[in-house]
Structures are given as structure tokens and as C-alpha cells.
Regions:
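Extracellular beta-propeller repeat domains
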Residues: 2-434
Length: 434
């Protein structure tokens, strides 16, 4: 991300609900409601809630929903030890209540500073990563076991040691055999990150294998985002930097494919090199790719595209589509470029999400009518994608800087988090109702 833009001026918090509505399309606007305002240490109206505080700063934490409609996520800071939390939001007759179900940093061997979201298994257990902590202070993959009585127990499945990866951001994903796959932003053979596999070996133990070390030539570097898997077991992801083309002295980023080649080995193929050419996006940040029903991939880039931001120096970000072609190749098409001069937002840092009708939903980190970011919907009409702003963040008491993406519940409501803002400037969890 560009330095100097990670924190924007916040409007003083006065109310818990933000209902300012806007739509750039013709359909009815959506309504946003805050479910929880996270509270940093020392927030008003009281003094210091030292080491008993709520978590705060839910960074790139996409929420996860269980079959009962409960929501789960992470905060990078706060909790009784100060190194972040895992939280649960429960819907009751009187509204939503938040509970911290795990606080990191008891001895830092358990991990610290979870940057991303969580993966839920069929038994109701949660899996995630922390950027730091662990036995080697290089981050961990962890499991939170639901004890069934309202309590949770944490187990570190693997502690990275820098040579096999450092600083995982995104939650790992499962394959059908119960193996976990993910990325680390740095470390590995060339210190530009890794893709890894964790395999259960019995007795609650796991072994790790580095599938690929990034940074050797033009294969990409710094994979913040997680992985997705196709029906054949191939993995797909993005790197923030690296690749064949330069942006501001560093690579513009890539989309890559990892394929198993037998004997436990994997090969990497760069299927797209982003380029700063006034059309293509560049620097895909922390949003994982998604598939449509035809096998096409969709993602976002934080920069690039047709319209210029930052005084005309760089693009405002894009949503793009990757389509497989003959011979194992792929073609990329920008389907939407954000215009920082309008209400549509800029700098999307997270993944997009499909609904049943084929519309795409996501967030922008900055921009919008109130300059606090947006939640948006993209609709395909007559071969062209058009944007509707579902909610502009930044009103008094509302959240700002929605770094994470969105999820649906069964009723079609959307849920997400903002990194900042809310009643206590510690970020929010919110619901958007169509």
C-alpha cells in the first residue's frame, strides 16, 4: 500500500448506527448497521481497560459464518495480552453480542497478531494464522477447538521458522483429504514468501512442506493473499509484487498456478503478469481469488486501471477476470476500474464475492462519498459491468477503511469489518441489508 494513506482522519463517534444511504445504480439503496464497535485500550467513557480490553483493529479479517448464523473473525491487536484476538458475534433477541473466544500472546508461543480471517471445518473448529509469534517468532497456523460448552482451546499446528516461510496473512484452506494450504508473505529460499501444505500425521501432529518459494526471477514475490483450489487439485493465488513488469521500481504483481507433478512435487506457472499501462491493474493485495461456475477466476488489484488517483500518479484499482484458454494459458480482462474522483471508491484490498444471480460484491479501502471507503455491487448488463455503491463509510460513528471483504448469510444480508472508526476508533463489524 502507498505510505501515508493507511490512516485517514476519522470523524468523531456520536452514534452506533450509520444509515446514510447511497446507490450509483437505479436499484434501491442498502442499509448498514453496526454490529460491534471494537474498543482499544483507554477508550472513553472509562479509563484504561488495560489487559481486559476488547480486541481492536480487525485488519484483513473476512468474517466467517457458522450454520447457526454466528460470525467469527480476528483482530490484530487488543485482548488481555495485547497481541490480538479471535471473536464471536452472536445474534440474540436484543441484538448482537461480541465475545472474545481467544486472546493471543500469553507466551507468544501460541502466536500473535492475526492479520487474516478464519476457516471453519465441519466439526465447528476454526483455523487461522498469526503473522508473528510461535516457537520461532515467524508466525503460526493454529486451530481453535470448540469444546461444546462455550469455551475454546487453541492448538498450534505449525510454527514457521523463516526458512520455510515467515509471516502468514491469510487463513489456510482445506482439500478433500484434510490437508491445509496457504501462503507466507516472506521467508523461504529467496525471502519473498512461500506457498505451503500442512498434512496431518496422526496423534494431532502436522508436517509442513514448502510447495514453492517465491522470488526466483520473475515468478512473483510477497503473496499476501491466500489460495484457492480447482477440482483437479491445482492451486491459484496472487503475489503483491514481482513478475515480469516493473511498477515504481518493483514488480507489478502476478497471478500464479501451482500444479502437483507427482512424488509430492509441485510446479509453478505465472498465468498473468500485471503491468502499469493505464488499463491493467497492478499490485493485488490481500484478497484471494474466486471461481465462477465456468472456471474463470476473479480478483482485485489495489492500484492500476483506467482512472488516476494520488494526484494523477497511479490508478485507483480494478476488478479483473482470468479466463482459461487452449494450451494451459489464461487471458486477463479488467472488468471494472475504480474512479477515485467519484463516489465509487478506490483501492480495493480484498476479494470479491458472487451472489446466485452472478453479481459481484466487495469493498474499497478508501474513497467514496465520505472518503472512508465503500461497499459495492457490480452487475453485468449488455456485456458491461456497472457499479452500485451499497454503502459509503465514514459517517459519524460509522466504520472507515474496510480492508476485508464481504460474506453472505442465508437471507442475503452482507457482513464485514472495518479496520478503523466506530464508537471507539478501533474498527467495526457491520451488516448491510439489501
Amino acid at each position: 500500500m502507498r505510505s501515508g494513506r493507511l490512516h485517514i482522519a476519522l470523524i468523531a463517534a456520536l452514534a452506533i448506527y450509520a444509515t446514510l444511504l447511497i446507490g450509483t445504480g437505479t436499484s434501491a439503496a442498502a442499509q448498514e448497521m453496526l454490529l460491534h464497535s471494537f474498543r482499544p485500550y483507554g477508550s472513553p467513557p472509562c479509563c484504561f481497560h488495560a489487559r481486559t480490553a476488547d480486541g481492536f483493529d480487525p485488519f484483513y479479517s473476512n468474517l466467517t459464518i457458522d450454520t447457526a448464523g454466528n460470525l467469527y473473525g480476528t483482530t490484530t491487536a487488543g485482548g488481555i495480552f495485547g497481541y490480538g484476538t479471535v471473536f464471536k458475534l452472536t445474534h440474540t433477541a436484543s441484538g448482537w453480542t461480541e465475545a472474545v473466544i481467544y486472546a493471543f500472546g500469553h507466551n507468544l508461543a501460541d502466536g500473535g497478531v492475526p492479520e487474516g480471517g478464519l476457516t471453519l471445518d465441519a466439526a465447528g473448529n476454526l483455523y487461522g494464522t498469526t503473522h508473528g509469534g510461535g516457537a520461532n517468532n515467524s508466525g503460526v497456523v493454529f486451530e481453535l477447538v470448540n469444546n461444546g460448552d462455550g469455551t475454546w482451546a487453541e492448538k498450534v499446528l505449525y510454527s514457521f521458522n523463516n526458512t520455510d516461510g515467515y509471516g502468514p496473512w491469510a487463513a489456510p484452506i482445506f482439500d478433500a483429504a484434510g490437508n491445509l494450504y496457504g501462503t507466507t508473505e516472506s521467508g523461504g529460499a529467496y525471502n519473498y514468501g512461500t506457498a505451503y501444505e500442512l498434512t496431518p500425521t496422526g496423534g494431532g501432529n502436522w508436517s509442513e512442506q514448502v510447495l514453492h518459494s517465491f522470488g526466483n526471477g520473475t515468478d512473483g514475490a510477497t503473496p499476501f493473499a491466500g489460495l484457492v483450489m480447482d477440482a483437479s487439485g491445482n492451486l491459484y493465488g496472487t503475489t503483491w509484487l514481482g513478475g515480469a513488469n516493473l511498477c515504481d521500481g518493483a514488480g507489478c504483481g502476478t497471478v500464479f498456478k501451482l500444479s502437483p507433478t507427482g512424488g509430492g512435487n509441485w510446479s509453478e506457472q505465472v498465468i498473468h503478469n500485471f503491468i502499469n499501462n493505464g488499463v491493467d491493474g497492478n499490485e493485488p493485495w490481500a484478497g484471494s481469488l474466486i471461481f465462477d461456475s465456468s472456471g474463470n477466476l476473479y480478483g482485485t488489484t489495489t492500484l492500476g486501471g483506467t482512472y488516476l488517483c494520488e494526484g494523477g500518479s497511479v490508478g485507483c484499482g480494478t476488478v479483473y477476470e482470468m479466463t482459461p484458454t487452449a494450451g494451459g494459458n489464461w487471458t486477463e480482462q479488467v472488468i471494472y476500474s475504480f474512479n477515485g474522483g467519484g463516489p465509487g471508491g478506490e483501492d480495493p484490498t480484498s476479494a470479491v464475492l458472487f451472489d446466485a444471480a452472478g453479481n459481484l460484491y466487495g469493498t474499497t479501502y478508501f474513497g467514496g462519498l465520505l472518503e472512508g471507503g465503500t461497499a459495492f455491487k457490480l452487475t453485468l448488463r449488455d456485456g458491461r459491468w456497472t457499479e452500485q455503491v451499497l454503502h459509503p463509510f465514514g459517517a459519524s460513528g460509522d466504520g472507515v477503511t474496510p480492508a476485508s471483504g464481504l460474506i453472505f448469510d442465508r437471507a442475503g444480508n452482507l457482513y464485514g469489518t472495518t479496520m478503523e472508526g466506530g464508537l471507539y476508533d478501533g474498527g467495526t463489524a457491520y451488516e448491510i441489508t439489501p
